[in-house]
């Protein structure tokens, strides 16, 4: 398969690109230049690997979920344990890389958006480590849902700005963070939290997250002497999935499955299934599939999980859907909750609600596969942050 994206203008087929105001164009070009240089600099790579190993705690285990495998009665189920990273999710793979890049570029301050708070915590964490000032924008609704993470960010020295505009969720936080970046561009680096935004962000985030798929490949081959037959990951903006899928894109014998949030159901207005129900448009500087009405107004995304309710999806996922290399599906709130409880009870591992969407789809897929086949789930984060809202949800039901 001949797959080499993005092209030199930052396009993934028709997707991606750089739809930014003049005021930002210089900064994204400067960032692209700095990123290219850093990737070719052995010292930078050495420093990044040092922090990934000694600070983040990589590599993360590839765990054979024996009880889940028996329960499903099909493929061997493996979990890539991104929940065991420092700060409890895959997000820090990207924030540590971008923060080192910010230091290299001579920036003193970092701005970021956050939904579930995981990216905010991971950003505040690396800013504390590297002595950078940190401002985090978070939607009002998410601030309410994720009080603990807000306190965590403040403990780490970050300033958390609550965004009341729009629906008070991730999309609105990104808007405000971009606005802030425009007016502080001389001394501030924007750490985008997913494979979104204008080029080179989708590529930078994908490349820093690819450590997930690269490790998985190596670990699975060491255990089974071959590649897995299937790989499953959840998708909001799509960074854990892109990090898991990208190293496998050329291995066509490996089936790749991306799992979106169907919320209350894709037939309702309350979902975040962008690739299932969306159409092409431009948001936050990039062309991608979006949830929008006929007038092109962005619709509200809904999911029980704060990390999946983004109304767009990364440009590379948009392309991978069109060319059929990744097959995209969606899982409802209820199915994700059921999978959350099942994994917790069967394996003693409490997954994030985001990751529970991937687990739920894997539970449908595994029984259809042969016993000598392997299925890897990207367990993108731990569920500590969700326990309170799950308790509330279950009491209401």
UniProtKB/Swiss-Prot annotation:
Metabolic or biological pathway, per its Swiss-Prot or TrEMBL entry: Amino-acid biosynthesis; L-tryptophan biosynthesis; L-tryptophan from chorismate: step 5/5
Residues the record lists as N6-(pyridoxal phosphate)lysine modifications: 91
Enzyme Commission (EC) number: 4.2.1.20
PROSITE patterns (alphabetical): TRP_SYNTHASE_BETA
GO MF assignments: tryptophan synthase activity
Enzyme class: lyase
Catalytic activity from the UniProt record: (1S,2R)-1-C-(indol-3-yl)glycerol 3-phosphate + L-serine = D-glyceraldehyde 3-phosphate + L-tryptophan + H2O
Subunit structure: Tetramer of two alpha and two beta chains.
Family: Belongs to the TrpB family.
Function, in words: The beta subunit is responsible for the synthesis of L-tryptophan from indole and L-serine.
Protein name: Tryptophan synthase beta chain
Lineage: Bacteria, Bacillati, Bacillota, Bacilli, Bacillales
């Amino acid at each position: 398969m001949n797959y080499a994206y993005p092209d030199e203008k930052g396009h993934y087929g028709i997707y991606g690109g750089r739809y930014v105001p003049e005021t930002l164009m210089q900064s994204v070009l400067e960032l692209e230049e700095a990123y290219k240089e850093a990737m070719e600099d052995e010292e930078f790579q050495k420093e990044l690997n040092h922090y990934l190993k000694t600070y983040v705690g990589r590599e993360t285990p590839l765990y054979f979920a024996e009880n889940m495998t028996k329960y499903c009665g099909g493929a061997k189920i493996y979990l890539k344990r991104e929940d065991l990273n420092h700060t409890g999710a895959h997000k820090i793979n990207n924030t540590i890389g971008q923060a080192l890049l910010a230091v290299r570029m001579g920036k003193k301050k970092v701005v970021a958006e956050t939904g579930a708070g995981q990216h905010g915590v991971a950003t505040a964490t690396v800013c504390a480590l590297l002595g950078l000032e940190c401002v985090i924008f978070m939607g009002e609704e998410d601030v309410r849902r994720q009080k603990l993470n807000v306190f965590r960010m403040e403990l780490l020295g970050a300033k958390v700005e609550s965004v009341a505009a729009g629906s008070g969720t991730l999309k609105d936080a990104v808007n405000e963070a971009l606005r802030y970046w425009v007016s502080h561009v001389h001394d501030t680096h924007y750490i985008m939290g997913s494979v979104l935004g204008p080029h080179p962000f989708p590529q930078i985030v994908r490349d820093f997250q690819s450590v997930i798929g690269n490790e998985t490949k190596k670990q699975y081959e060491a255990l089974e002497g071959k590649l897995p037959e299937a790989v499953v990951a959840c998708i909001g903006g799509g960074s854990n999935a892109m990090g898991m899928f990208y190293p496998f894109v050329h291995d066509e014998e490996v089936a790749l499955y991306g799992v979106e949030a169907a919320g209350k159901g894709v037939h309702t207005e309350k979902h975040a299934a962008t690739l299932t129900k969306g159409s092409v448009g431009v948001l936050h500087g990039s062309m991608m599939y979006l949830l929008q009405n006929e007038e092109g107004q962005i619709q509200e995304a809904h999911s029980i999980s704060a990390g999946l309710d983004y109304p767009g999806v990364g440009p590379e996922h948009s392309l991978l859907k069109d060319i059929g290399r990744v097959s995209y599906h969606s899982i409802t709130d209820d199915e994700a909750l059921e999978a959350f409880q099942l994994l917790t009870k069967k394996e003693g591992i409490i997954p994030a609600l985001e990751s529970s969407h991937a687990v739920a789809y894997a539970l449908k897929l595994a029984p259809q596969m042969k016993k000598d086949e392997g299925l890897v789930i990207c367990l993108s984060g731990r569920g500590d942050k969700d326990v309170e809202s799950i308790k509330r949800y279950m009491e209401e039901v």
